[in-house]
């Protein structure tokens, strides 16, 4: 069995830094890099891509809504499909250009924050994201929440998919993530998270907040770089998986 560990990195801006990217880069096998809309800037993007290349880590674009102040975690009411296509294509292209400068290659795309959350439940948003990815490069792997409308849109567009589960987030009974506004939405205990991820990988399922077992294909596991104790959590997850005979490797080539 093989599984990927992905992490959202490069989410600083100017002199402001978030998380320990250098430490996470030694644990993750794929990283999703902010492209300047919810976080990131040309210098941070370039430094993050170079760090990934040095560590043999696959890189992907992490497009979000244009919302630095809200870190891309706030929906944008009234946004059109064309506007979503444009902002996604723009951000993918930006990372592709920076990656070329750093001698690396973009292999995948994963939507960020509110853009992803809305798309998991809204057909128009999901289709617009998939359409933009396909137009830019149909070989890019689309990282999607398993069983979501994002997954269906990716399938309909004929994109290669990587089905994602979240190590440090709680699930609702419908398979969507519990809102960060609710208590218990983000998990922090490293041992609990490691055991949880092992069960996800072995069983192909997640357990919701009410105890419901939801079948989900698991190609990649996300550990958020901005979660408190992220490095310790990521190390624990990787150790647990490898100790159980599971190969930890990127879903796309580096």
From Swiss-Prot:
* Record InterPro entries: Glyco_hydro/deAcase_b/a-brl, LamB/YcsF/PxpA-like
CDD domains the record matches: LamB_YcsF_like
Keyword set, alphabetical order: ATP-binding, Hydrolase, Nucleotide-binding
The record ties this protein, via Gene3D superfamilies, to:
Glycoside hydrolase/deacetylase (3.20.20.370)
Its UniProt entry gives the catalysed reaction(s) as:
5-oxo-L-proline + ATP + 2 H2O = L-glutamate + ADP + phosphate + H(+)
Q: Which GO terms describe its biological process?
A: carbohydrate metabolic process
Summarize subunit and interaction data from the UniProt record for this chain.
Answer: Forms a complex composed of PxpA, PxpB and PxpC.
Query: What job does the chain carry out?
Result: Catalyzes the cleavage of 5-oxoproline to form L-glutamate coupled to the hydrolysis of ATP to ADP and inorganic phosphate.
Similarity comment text for this entry: Belongs to the LamB/PxpA family.
Q: Which protein, by its recorded name, is this? A: 5-oxoprolinase subunit A
């Amino acid at each position: 069995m093989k599984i990927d560990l992905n992490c959202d990195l490069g989410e600083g801006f100017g002199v402001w830094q978030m998380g320990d990217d250098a430490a996470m880069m030694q644990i993750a096998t794929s990283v999703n890099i902010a492209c300047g809309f919810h976080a990131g800037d040309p210098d941070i993007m370039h430094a993050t891509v170079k760090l990934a290349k040095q560590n043999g880590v696959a890189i992907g674009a992490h497009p979000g809504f244009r919302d630095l102040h809200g870190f891309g975690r706030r929906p944008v009411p009234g946004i059109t499909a064309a506007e979503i296509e444009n902002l996604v294509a723009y951000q993918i292209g930006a990372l592709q250009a920076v990656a070329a400068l750093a001698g690396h290659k973009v292999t995948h795309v994963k939507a960020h924050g509110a853009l992803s959350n809305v798309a998991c439940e809204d057909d128009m948003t999901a289709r617009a994201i998939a359409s933009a990815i396909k137009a830019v490069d149909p070989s890019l792997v689309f990282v999607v929440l398993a069983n979501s409308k994002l997954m269906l849109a990716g399938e309909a567009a004929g994109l290669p998919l990587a089905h994602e589960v979240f190590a440090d987030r709680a699930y609702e009974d419908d398979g969507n993530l519990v809102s960060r506004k609710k208590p218990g939405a983000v998990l922090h205990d490293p041992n609990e998270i490691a055991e949880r991820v092992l069960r996800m990988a072995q069983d192909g399922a997640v357990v919701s907040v009410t105890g419901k077992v939801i079948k989900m294909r698991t190609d990649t596991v996300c550990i958020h770089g901005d979660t408190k104790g992220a490095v310790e959590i990521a190390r624990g997850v990787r150790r647990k998986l490898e100790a159980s005979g599971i190969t930890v490797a990127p879903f796309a080539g580096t």
